[in-house]
Amino acid sequence: MSLSGSFDTMPLPELLSWLDTTARSGRLTIDSLRAGTTLVVDNHRITGCQSSEPPTLLGQFLLFHGAISEETLQVAMREQDRNGRRLGEILLDGGSISAEVLDGFLAAKAEETILSTFDVADARFDFDGDTRPPRGVLPVSMPIHFVIAKGLRRIEETAEAALFLEQRGQLLRRTDRRPSPRIGAVWPLRQAYEAVNGARTVEEIALHVHGTRAQVLQRLYELYKEGYIELATPERSVALLLPPSILEEPLTSINVSAELPSLVPRRIADDATALNSVERYLLSRCDGTKDVRSIAMVAPIRPWEVADTIRSLLSRGLLEVGRRPAG
């Protein structure tokens, strides 16, 4: 039996409960503006998952938890582009991560992929009885009733955190309280703390730390309740100190699409008041040291969106792009 609809008419908890009580087996596909996710269901359990949402992809998930560096991810993804091997295999063979640690992160990634479907309020779904796992699916074994319980708790916790942290006209800044040893020891908590600068929204902070909104809100709320960060009215932005340009022959023409991946973008304007979170994030990465391809490899954004956004920033005079000097 197949079933199609939207979360407006059948919310995710209700949909999963129906799959559980009727002991259905098959594929549940959830499509939103943000991403597409497939869950493989088999007799009261979710046995596989797959998502196109950037923060739930393996490389971004490992960055969020501090398991690898951005430089390591860039090298691995360049090798993946050359030979098509799986990212995990490349990281293992290169000694960047052990098999035991990778297995642990894959299990955690699978759970986050499944639970992140509860972050989506507006989506369409399609369930069919095809039990064959799609290519690239991540195996998992989670009882559906367990997923529903954790998902509902996630919704409540995220809503509570957002109620306190996302106030109109106010942004998060650090307080004078000295960071605890735990903040220094827990990578996602430390990164969330360091990303708070009095000028970034929660969405921007999530981009900088490579996490989902729910993951980041959880860490920020912990920091907020313990007095390490606070809400404040943002002050007038301070002019950005830009390094000297290293670009050879900066290009002023907008028609650079074919060459864009190999070009190096550099921010040349400070006014970011009319920009969205993705634009501000990418502007912060355009420091004249990395080409567009390298930025796209580590950004928690789809590559085409990186390219489109950089083209837009270029056309508005906020960036220059050029070639690296030879040699």
Task: Please identify what each model-predicted range represents.
Residues 1-327:
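Acidic, Ser/Thr/Pro-enriched low-complexity segments and adjacent helix/loop capping patches
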